[in-house]
Regions:
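Interdomain hinge/linker elements that couple catalytic modules in large macromolecular machines
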Residues: 132, 137-249
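Short regulatory helix/loop adjacent to the ATP-binding pocket of P-loop NTPases
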Residues: 102-119, 131-136
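Short glycine-rich substrate-engagement loop in P-loop NTPases that contacts/grips substrate
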Residues: 32-65
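Conserved lysine of the Walker
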Residues: 11
Length: 249
């Protein structure tokens, strides 16, 4: 299983919680050089498993273990080896997660083994999930019971209106929602947004050339001011950059 989605949408946390129901859980992260080397230097899948056991100090038992390969976009070799987990160790539960996989696939020309992996996508929290995170389960039930043409009590309508306005500000990124749910502070959510924005901008340089990364950072900073408007590359480019270069990036 390959779990896809943007950074910081909770992929790793979700897998860890799911794995709590299994006898053993082995997690490796392909942002670490010594872990990536396992997949680039070892080709036999059983030797790969043995190497993972060695660095994790845990036994991997098919049928009882979940092997979690995080940040798989950092290793083409690991992606290619997924088919051999499927073919040679079909009883072993393997979950991988990655961000910006589509970008890597397009820029580097590789693909996932056809018919050997399944995909699930994880998105930011919906409005329903936002209400649940706030602990307002009864209000959520009222929302789910609403039907067109059926009246809604004014207090319920007013509270939902308040929450949807908050949701428009907080958004659905799990950490921002958690900060807001815990404190009720929009400022706390805003601080989280700034941290997330910085981490996203750092990723531009990883997946594009330096010049393109600078264009992307410029667009990223400008987009909030263009929300709701028709895309205009000249406006997004600003005075210092050409619209053609920005469009290409």
């Amino acid at each position: 299983l390959v779990l896809r989605g943007a950074r910081q949408t909770g992929k790793t946390t979700l897998v860890r919680k799911f794995a709590a129901g299994f006898e053993t859980f082995v997690e490796i992260n392909l942002e670490k050089d010594h872990v990536r080397r396992i997949f680039s230097e070892v080709k036999d899948i059983k030797d790969v498993v043995q190497s993972i056991e060695g660095i994790s100090n845990k036994r991997i038992i098919p049928g009882k273990t979940i092997l979690f390969i995080d940040e798989i976009q950092n290793s083409v070799s690991a992606i290619k080896l997924l088919r051999f987990f499927h073919e040679e160790m079909p009883q072993l539960h393997v979950i991988s997660a990655g961000s910006l996989l589509e970008v890597r696939m397009k820029t580097e020309g590789w693909s996932f083994p056809v018919g050997r992996v399944e995909f699930l996508y994880l998105y930011p929290a919906s409005f329903d999930e936002f209400i649940r995170a706030r602990g307002e389960g009864v209000l959520l039930e009222e929302l789910m019971a609403m039907r067109v043409g059926r009246g809604t009590p004014l207090p319920v309508h007013d509270r939902l209106t308040e929450l949807i306005l908050d949701y428009m500000i907080v958004g659905g990124m799990p950490e921002a929602v958690a900060q807001y749910a815990a404190s009720g502070s929009l400022a706390a959510a805003r601080n989280c947004h700034e941290s997330l924005s910085s981490s996203f901008k750092e990723d531009f340089a990883k997946y594009s050339r330096e010049a393109e990364a600078e264009h992307l950072k410029s667009v990223w900073d400008q987009v909030p001011f263009e929300a709701g408007s028709r895309i205009n590359y000249a406006r997004l480019a600003g005075e210092q950059r050409g619209s053609r270069e920005v469009s290409k990036a």
